[in-house]
Amino acid sequence: MRGISGFGLTSLALSAGLANAIDLDVNNRDSVLKASKIVVDNILSVYNNYTESPGGIPGLLPQPYYWYNAGNMFNSLIKYWALSGDQSIVPTLQSALVFQLGPDFNYMPPNQSKSLGNDDQAAWALAAMRAAEYDLPVPNDLLSNNITWASIADTVFKEQVARWDTESCGG
């Protein structure tokens, strides 16, 4: 599975204007949180500038980033939220995770059908699993349909297992 590389994440942060060094003391929790907030704010600046522009779609990043990159980014942002307690990003996380679900709540949205593969879908399912692990609040419109982050991840897993084909491609 492809992942967002350190280079890709660094490029995304730099494209938001983060070109100066960040003052960081890795032995000081407050310093780590402050440095993390700077990086997160810059990443979200790129994301928000794209999604709030005409034609922007919640959960997607601008070119050259792919759909799975956004899924991996949100997975990381969920962990940041859980470790930092930064509640300001919860609506952004929820919006992205829900908008990219697709009509069957399985991270197969019609707007990604041209290039969607198991690895891409799994990137988003892993973000949903992390959301479940860290108790990211589930939006009421999902809860009212008995849908949780864990049930979404489970749905994707079951769909991918059902697609497993050892006959034509060795699995």
Language-model features: where?
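Fungal secretory targeting signals
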Residues: 1-25
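Short, flexible/disordered intra-domain loops and linkers
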Residues: 4, 137-144
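Low-complexity, Ser/Thr/Pro/Gly-enriched N-terminal "stalk/linker" regions
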Residues: 20-111, 144-170
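Short, helix-capping/interhelical loops that line the mouth of catalytic, cofactor-
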Residues: 22, 128-131, 135
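The core hydrophobic/aromatic register in alpha-helical repeat solenoids, strongest
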Residues: 77-80, 127-131
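Short coil/turn linking the two alpha-helices of tandem helical-hairpin repeats
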Residues: 81, 85, 132-139
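Mobile, glycine-rich extracellular loop/lid and propeptide segments
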Residues: 115-128, 152
